[in-house]
């Protein structure tokens, strides 16, 4: 594949997906961990409102994955990935410019919706290319997903460091930097992802609630939901604890690296 072309790629290069996950997590973890501090210190919101906004942001992403996956099946993964990048850029720009409550809520929700669009689509592409790789006797699909997870965790480590370095000049600049990261990702993915039209196969579709009839799958959902419930407390609890213990805003970055 040429290093640069003005036309979208004809074939999918799997490392593009790994790099996307790495960059997406940098753009996410450079911004979102510092959102609670911005809402508390700059916008002077109460703890209840901060928790509500963070909860809406989380639901807008994790709670909407099924919609993002459905749209990817219908319109193609590439289109939905690019749309997700656009939506997240819009959310970050709104957070950077907002001066009142409702634009902040909208911006936070848009950042979540963006993730709900591109995350399932990228994983679907990885599953497809991993299956093809395994069928050709190359790297297995499980190995590709393991590398995908490693790249995501690396981004989750570097992101808070990047946000911490920018925290001295204010959250709005952090949000603008996050928007820039996703705008760059949008441009790169436009050229590096092959065209992917909507699904035209005649395979039988089943209702989305069908997997809920499987007890093991329901148990997995409940276990993962419990993990999300506990993990997302960090976005609110860590800033509060740092303030209580007399720490600085920059101290948040290494704590999220460890988390």
Residues covered by each model-derived region:
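Helix-loop boundary and gating motifs at the non-cytosolic
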Residues: 8-58, 218-253, 257
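C-terminal membrane-cytosol helix-exit motif in multi-pass small-molecule transporters
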Residues: 180-198
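Juxtamembrane intracellular "pre-TM" segments in multi-pass secondary transporters
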Residues: 1-11, 194-222
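Cytoplasmic helix-loop-helix junction between adjacent transmembrane helices
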Residues: 107-152
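Helix-breaking motifs and short loop linkers at transmembrane-helix boundaries and internal kinks
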Residues: 44, 76, 97-102
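Paired small-residue
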Residues: 20, 91, 102-110
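Residue-level signature of mid-helix packing/kink "hotspots" within the transmembrane helices
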Residues: 58-66, 156-157
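Structural signature of the two symmetry-related core transmembrane helices
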Residues: 79-94
């Amino acid at each position: 594949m040429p290093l640069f072309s003005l036309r979208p790629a004809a074939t999918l290069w799997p490392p593009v997906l790994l790099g996307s996950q790495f960059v997406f997590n940098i753009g996410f973890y450079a911004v979102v961990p510092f959102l609670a501090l911005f809402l508390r210190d700059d916008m002077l919101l109460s703890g209840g409102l901060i928790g509500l906004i963070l909860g809406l942001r989380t639901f807008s992403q994790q709670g909407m994955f099924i919609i993002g996956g459905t749209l990817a099946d219908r319109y193609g993964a590439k289109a939905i990935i690019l749309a997700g990048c656009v939506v997240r850029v819009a959310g970050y720009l709104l957070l950077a410019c907002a001066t009142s409550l409702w634009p902040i809520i909208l911006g936070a929700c848009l950042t979540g919706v963006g993730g709900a669009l591109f995350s399932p689509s990228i994983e679907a592409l990885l599953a497809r290319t991993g299956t093809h790789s395994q069928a050709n006797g190359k790297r297995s699909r499980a190995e590709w997903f393991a590398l995908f997870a490693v790249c995501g965790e690396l981004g989750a480590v570097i992101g808070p460091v990047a946000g911490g370095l920018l925290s001295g000049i204010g959250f709005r600049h952090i949000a603008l930097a996050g928007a820039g990261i996703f705008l760059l990702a949008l441009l790169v993915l436009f050229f590096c992802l092959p065209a992917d039209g909507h699904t035209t196969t005649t395979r039988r579709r089943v209702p989305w609630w069908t997997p809920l009839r499987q007890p093991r799958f329901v148990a997995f959902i409940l276990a993962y939901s419990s993990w999300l419930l506990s993990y997302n407390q960090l976005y609110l609890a860590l800033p509060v604890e740092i303030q209580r213990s007399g720490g600085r805003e920059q101290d948040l970055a290494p704590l999220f690296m460890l988390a």
